[in-house]
């Protein structure tokens, strides 16, 4: 048992390091609405990684512009992203499958970032707008947007805006904001 646990943790750590390094090296970004194939690595003077705060930090609640409604929201994820994966798990636990639709991007992030290429068995393309790349979803928000293009994305189909792209916040949104719709009041957060 201990050996299996040790082996699993080392494999997991290796995958995360590989993923993180590749992700930050090859991932482009949107600058003033244009896809730029540049490194998005940011660091301070000492060389330590500095994460830029997300622009999309909205909440879904009865008191906000983004109200809890069935079939109003859509999730963009990659099975290659552990942060997106945990959001999918919460969606399942909170019985949101019938209320929040999902598109899965191709797991390989190439020079144009995440794609909706459907040659991966579980990638289903962009079912809302038929876009080719995930950055085009971000461009729908603003033609002058400057941001990294990440998953998961919680998308509002009604306003055509990104509600949130921080997995920890999407988890909390899913944990409580749709309770009255699903009648699932279990607290998983």
What name fits each language-model region?
Residues 23-189:
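GST-like domain detector, emphasizing the conserved glutathione-binding G-site
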């Amino acid at each position: 048992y201990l050996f299996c646990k040790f082996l699993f943790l080392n494999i997991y750590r290796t995958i995360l390091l590989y993923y993180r390094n590749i992700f930050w090296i090859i991932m482009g970004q949107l600058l003033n609405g244009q896809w730029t194939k540049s490194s998005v690595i940011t660091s301070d003077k000492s060389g330590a990684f500095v994460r830029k705060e997300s622009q999309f930090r909205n909440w879904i609640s009865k008191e906000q512009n983004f109200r809890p409604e069935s079939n109003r929201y859509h999730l963009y994820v990659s099975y290659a992203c552990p942060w997106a994966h945990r959001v999918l798990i919460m969606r399942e636990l909170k019985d949101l499958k019938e209320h929040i639709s999902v598109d899965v991007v191709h797991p390989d992030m190439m020079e144009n970032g995440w794609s909706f290429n459907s040659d991966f068995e579980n990638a289903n393309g962009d079912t809302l707008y038929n876009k080719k790349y995930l950055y085009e979803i971000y461009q729908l928000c603003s033609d002058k947007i400057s941001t990294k293009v990440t998953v998961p994305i919680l998308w509002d189909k009604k306003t055509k805006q990104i509600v949130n792209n921080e997995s920890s916040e999407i988890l909390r949104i899913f944990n409580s904001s749709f309770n009255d719709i699903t009648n699932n009041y279990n607290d998983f957060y």
